[in-house]
Regions:
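Short, well-ordered loop/turn elements at secondary-structure boundaries
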Residues: 57-58, 79-81, 112-115, 122-124, ...
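Helical (often loop-to-helix) elements that flank the catalytic cores of nucleotide-handling enzymes
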Residues: 94-110, 132-158, 180-187
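Long, low-complexity interaction regions most often at the N-terminus
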Residues: 2, 31-33, 112-113, 142-145
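Catalytic micro-motifs at enzyme active sites that drive phosphoryl/nucleotidyl and oxygen chemistry
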Residues: 70-76, 105-123, 157-161
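DNA replication initiation on ssDNA origins
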Residues: 1-83, 90-101, 168, 176-179
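Histidine-centered divalent-metal-coordination microenvironment in nucleic-acid enzymes
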Residues: 86, 114-139, 169-173, 177
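Basic/polar, cationic surfaces and motifs that engage anionic cell-wall
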Residues: 160-187
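Structural alpha-beta junctions
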Residues: 16, 51-59, 105-115, 151-158
């Protein structure tokens, strides 16, 4: 009976919570949740277990993939690196998301770059996210080198040079992109 209840609970977990649980699996640092609205930009900081209790089905909700020592989203307070990521602004290319994904699957993933753990449709583009074994901020120079390699490799697909920082916030699956009025989804 307990197993059946646990399985039912798993089914009811939102896409957002499942994503957070995977990305921040054993995170000990602070995670930033941000909301961008007509009133401006607001951010809050939570530990992993606090964050999963929140709602994410609203417009323009983002989180950090890496964590911080303090409740400040600044590079000097970076605690753990959990993931590498590339933000593909596909709307700035001559290709559809589907064409880009087909090209990446056929010619890049598993060849020039590893296959990402997550591909997320952010509304106007795609996020490619690679989970890494949690490492301290001392690994930042290596992390940056890999990010820059991914950027150079994926530049023709709309890779955003402005989105290569370890403190970056990305839209969370289950939230709504207000520019396109579409749900951010894991593909």
């Amino acid at each position: 009976m307990v197993l059946a209840l646990k399985q039912e609970d798993e089914k009811e977990l939102s896409q957002s919570v499942k994503y957070i649980n995977i990305v921040h699996r054993n995170s000990e640092g602070w995670i930033t949740k941000a909301k961008i609205s007509a009133e401006g930009y607001k951010q809050w900081h939570y530990k992993h277990m606090q964050l999963v209790k929140l709602k994410f089905d609203k417009d323009n909700v983002c989180i950090t993939l890496n964590t911080f020592y303090k409740t400040y989203r600044r590079i000097e307070y970076l605690r753990e690196l959990n993931a590498l990521f590339i933000d593909l602004d596909t709307y700035k290319t001559d290709f559809t998301k589907e064409q880009i994904l087909m090209n990446l699957n056929e010619n890049y993933f598993g060849k020039n770059i590893p296959t990402p753990n997550f591909i997320i449709d952010s509304g106007r583009g795609l996020y490619l996210i690679w989970l890494i074994k949690k490492v301290p901020s001392m690994a930042l120079p290596l992390w940056k080198a890999v990010e820059e390699y991914f950027y150079r490799t994926l530049k023709e697909f709309g890779a955003d040079i402005q989105a290569l920082d370890a403190t970056r916030i990305l839209r969370i699956p289950g939230s709504i992109n207000s520019k396109t009025h579409t749900e951010v989804k894991i593909i």
